[in-house]
Amino acid sequence: MIKQKKKIIKITKKKFPKGIVHIKTTYNNVLVSVSDPKGNVIAWSSSGACGFKSSKKATPLATKTTTAIAVKKAIEQGLQKVEINISGPGTGRETALKCVQSLGLRISCIRDVTPLPHNGCRPSKRRRI
């Protein structure tokens, strides 16, 4: 009879000294995700997941809370230096930057990656109220 060896699996948390903070602000919501330089997501948060509902999800307070939660999760995993990618036209973009700075992370660069058309598709008709 063959004896099988028991495999012992060690679970270790990886340390991520560098990372990228992706902040997407829309007119209705805020999404924040923190990834390593390769693009693998370490931590994320959204204003809906933080407990804000309906039109309150797009406020600067919601942006600050959402950013703080996502970045604190990443700091627990050893994050120290970040690049910031901001996209979208929503409110609270500056609030998110101040929040990342206040949490003690070193910011290496800030990029605005909002997609802008070079006169591509025709926009939808104007809203009349």
UniProtKB/Swiss-Prot annotation:
Task: Tell me the GO molecular function terms.
Answer: rRNA binding; structural constituent of ribosome
> Where found in the cell?
Plastid, Chloroplast
Q: Name one GO cellular component term.
A: ribonucleoprotein complex
| Keywords in alphabetical order | Chloroplast, Plastid, Ribonucleoprotein, Ribosomal protein, RNA-binding, rRNA-binding
For this entry, list what GO says about its biological process.
Answer: translation
Q: What is its main location?
A: plastid
- PROSITE patterns with a match to the protein in the record: RIBOSOMAL_S11
Q: Which Pfam family, any one of them, does this sequence belong to?
A: Ribosomal_S11
Task: Say if the entry is tagged with keyword RNA-binding.
Answer: yes
Protein family: Belongs to the universal ribosomal protein uS11 family.
* Subunit: Part of the 30S ribosomal subunit.
Q: What's the protein name?
A: Small ribosomal subunit protein uS11c
The primary gene name is: rps11
